[in-house]
Amino acid sequence: MRVYLVGGAVRDRLLNFPVKERDWVVVGGTSEALLSLGYQQVGKDFPVFLHPQTHEEYALARTERKSGLGYTGFTCYAAPDVTLEDDLQRRDLTVNAIAQTPTGELVDPYHGVDDLNNRILRHVSDAFSEDPLRVLRVARFAARFAHLGFTIASETQALMSNMAINGELSVLTPERVWKETEKALASPSPQVFFQVLRDCGALAVLFPEIDNLFGVPAPEKWHPEIDTGIHTLMVLKVATELTDEVDSRFAALCHDLGKGLTPPEQWPHHYGHGPAGVKLVDQLCQRLRVPNSARDLAKLAAQYHDLVHTVTQLRPKTLLKLFDAVDAWRKPQRIEQLIIISEADARGRTGFENTPYPQGDCLRQAFKVASQVQVKNIVDSGLRGADIGHELRRQRQHALAQWKQQDDTAQDNTVT
C-alpha cells in the first residue's frame, strides 16, 4: 500500500496557508487491510477510514462514474488497481488534484502547481459537469482566494454556464446550497462568490431575489454606481471589512432585496422597500433553510437600515421603538450588528467607500444611555405589574431627551 497526502492540505501548504486538516488517499490497499491495522471505516457510499491514532481520514483510491441525477448519483469503484492518477482525475480543480508523498515529493499529473503559480482555478476534466455542487465550490474558492489574484479559467467558466443553462443546479438540496454559501460568507471576499454565480447564470437559479437587483436603478445622487445589484455586492464587501460574523454579512447582502419589487415606473425611487424586503428575506431563508439567527437579523436589517441612517434626527420615543423592535434589551449585540450593516450600506457606494458614519456612534450612545436606566430601582420604588414597564419607558425616554439636549448644546457650542 502507498499513502499520499491529497487535496486542500497540499494546496494550502503550497500557498503558505495554515493546514487545518489533512486527507490521505491509499493506493493499492483494501478495506480488509486497513481494518486489520486498526482503522475504523466511516464512509457509507465509498471506503473512508479513520486512522487509529490521528483520526485523520484515509480513503481508498477510487473512480466515480455518473449513474444518476445530481451530486449523489455516482457509482464508486475502489480497488487495488485504481491508480493515484485515476483518483486525482475525479477531483474538481487542478489545484485540488495534487498529491504529496510521505517524503514531501509532489505528484501533479494535471498541472495543478502551474495553475497555483498562475493563480488559475481550472477543472481537471469534463467530468466536472457531472456534479452541480462544483459550481458552488468553484465560486467559493474564487471568493476564498480572490485576494491572492485567483481567477477562473475561461473553459471552466463555460462549463459552469452550461450547467446552469441545462438545469443541472435544480437538483441541489437547500442544505448543500446554504452550506457552501455559509462558507463563502466566511471567506475574505464573499462578494466574489455571488459575482461568479451571476456570471455563470447560477445566481438567477439559486438566489433569484439577489439576481433581480441587477439592472434596477437607484437615484444617481445617492448611488453613483446606480445599479442596485452592484451596490449590494459593494455593501457586502464593506461589511466583510467591518465584521467576521456570517450573520451580519448575510444581512448586509439582503438589506435591499425589496428594491427588486419596485415597479419600473417608480424607478429610480424605492419607497417602502424596507418592509417589502422583509417578505423576500423570509422567502429566501425558508427556501434555503437558513439558520434562524441569520434570518432574523437579515429581516431586521431590511426593515430598519434606512431608519438607522436618520438616527441623529430621531425623537427619544422613536429610538425606544427601534430598540424594542430589534429586541435590543435581550439581545444588545443587535445594535452593533445593525450599525455595521447600516455603515456598510452607506459606504457601499461609489465615491463613499471611506466616508465616516457618525450615525453609528450616535445609535451606540443612545442605547447606552437608555440601558443605564435600571429596572431594579423602579421595582424598589414600590411599583408593581404593568406600572413597572410604563415607568421604565418613561425614565428611558426622559434619559434620552436629556442626552439629546446635552448633545445638541455641545454641538451648538462648537459652532464659531
Curated annotation (Swiss-Prot):
Chain sites annotated for binding Mg(2+): 21, 23
GO molecular function: ATP binding; CCA tRNA nucleotidyltransferase activity; cyclic-nucleotide phosphodiesterase activity; magnesium ion binding; phosphatase activity; tRNA binding
EC number(s) from the headed UniProt entry: 2.7.7.72, 3.1.3.-, 3.1.4.-
Keywords: ATP-binding, Hydrolase, Magnesium, Metal-binding, Multifunctional enzyme, Nickel, Nucleotide-binding, Nucleotidyltransferase, RNA repair, RNA-binding, Transferase, tRNA processing
Catalysed reactions, semicolon-separated: a tRNA precursor + 2 CTP + ATP = a tRNA with a 3' CCA end + 3 diphosphate; a tRNA with a 3' CCA end + 2 CTP + ATP = a tRNA with a 3' CCACCA end + 3 diphosphate
Residue ranges occupied by any HD domain in the UniProt entry: 228-329
Cofactor note: Magnesium is required for nucleotidyltransferase activity. Nickel for phosphatase activity.
Binding site for ATP: 8, 11, 91, 137, 140
Binding site for CTP: 8, 11, 91, 137, 140
Biological process annotations from GO: RNA repair; tRNA 3'-terminal CCA addition
Cofactor section: Mg(2+); Ni(2+)
NCBIfam families per the UniProt record, alphabetical: PRK10885.1
Protein function: Catalyzes the addition and repair of the essential 3'-terminal CCA sequence in tRNAs without using a nucleic acid template. Adds these three nucleotides in the order of C, C, and A to the tRNA nucleotide-73, using CTP and ATP as substrates and producing inorganic pyrophosphate. tRNA 3'-terminal CCA addition is required both for tRNA processing and repair. Also involved in tRNA surveillance by mediating tandem CCA addition to generate a CCACCA at the 3' terminus of unstable tRNAs. While stable tRNAs receive only 3'-terminal CCA, unstable tRNAs are marked with CCACCA and rapidly degraded.
Other comments on record: A single active site specifically recognizes both ATP and CTP and is responsible for their addition.
Comment block on domains: Comprises two domains: an N-terminal domain containing the nucleotidyltransferase activity and a C-terminal HD domain associated with both phosphodiesterase and phosphatase activities.
Description of how the protein assembles with itself and partners: Monomer. Can also form homodimers and oligomers.
Protein family: Belongs to the tRNA nucleotidyltransferase/poly(A) polymerase family. Bacterial CCA-adding enzyme type 1 subfamily.
Protein name: Multifunctional CCA protein
